[in-house]
Amino acid sequence: TFKENVFTSLFPRRKEVPKTLIFAKTDSHADDIIQIVRDEFGEGNEFCKKITYSAENPENTLNDFRNQYYPRIAVTVDMIATGTDVKPIECLVFMRDVRSKNYFEQMKGRGTRTLSKDDLQKVSPSASENKDHFVIVDAVGVTKSKKSETRTLERKPSVSMKELMMNVALGDKSEDTLTS
């Protein structure tokens, strides 16, 4: 299990759990994970927190996760999955599958930020070196599941919705029409 391996094989010289981000399927799933993590580690509310759009003060909690000692573990559904920079994250735990290749790459990107030893020690005092790697814990087979390519819509701004609908109704099945 994660708890058993975090101090032995994953981060053997650490005294505190490295900053860890857990990806959950739903808000309810996130709540269940938080309770289990707190129970397993024997820690209180500050140790593991939910950072979702529906959580209380998600921006404050995210800022604490980024810059403070607590929380050590954050659980999210989608809020931190893309476009959020939390450099001290050293471990990603996937408790949900992801079908989109691009989305999965963005989720993995949460762990890719490098950090100097001095900056890492501000939130993880027992860190003894620069952060130059991260660990993925795949609890659900997300690294092996088939991913689909996604593409952006290429809507032609000069074509109105009415005109697009008319073209489809008249049998136009061209790629340009169907992706606009």
Labelled PLM ranges:
Residues 45-152:
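Conserved RecA-like P-loop NTPase helicase motor core
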Residues 140-180:
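Long, largely alpha-helical accessory region at the distal end of helicase-like NTP-driven motors
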Residues 14-22, 125-135, 158:
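Glycine-rich, flexible loop segments associated with nucleotide phosphate handling
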Residues 30, 58-59, 101, 133, ...:
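Alpha-helix initiation and N-capping motif
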Residues 1-74:
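Conserved C-terminal RecA-like helicase domain
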Residues 26-35, 135-145, 167-169:
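Short, charged low-complexity intrinsically disordered segments located at boundaries
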